[in-house]
Regions:
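Intrinsically disordered, low-complexity regulatory segments of kinases
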Residues: 1-112
């Protein structure tokens, strides 16, 4: 028997969240307002990331463009058939949730 998960209501619009602390309707608005603030330099990649952000139902589905200057502890791993592979830590960290008070994304970085 399948029992659907019930999430709390969004603090912003008061509708039921689509994921844990995730309101698709409100986050679509927040992502769209931020489109002008970043670019990969490639329109196709930008569109792919933007489409992903608009269709995500919870934070684990969200892709973001990370500029090189937002990475640290960059470490070369190996060379493959299509390029070199590196790993790094992200200064800002991934999106945790929308902070209604500060009107910005609350983020979680690699160190904490």
């Amino acid at each position: 028997m399948y029992i659907p998960l019930k999430y709390k209501n969004c603090r912003e619009c008061k509708q039921e969240n689509t994921g844990m602390l995730y309101c698709k309707a409100c986050n679509v608005k927040h992502f769209q307002q931020n489109f002008k603030n970043w670019t990969s330099g490639n329109n196709d990649i930008d569109k792919f990331i933007q489409d992903n952000q608009l269709s995500a139902n919870f934070y684990g589905q969200v892709l973001e463009w990370i500029p090189y200057n937002k990475l640290y502890d960059i470490e070369y791993i190996a060379k493959g058939g299509f390029g070199k592979v590196y790993r790094a830590k992200w200064i800002d960290g991934f999106i945790g949730y929308w902070d209604n008070i500060n009107e910005n994304w609350e983020r979680h970085n690699s160190d904490g």
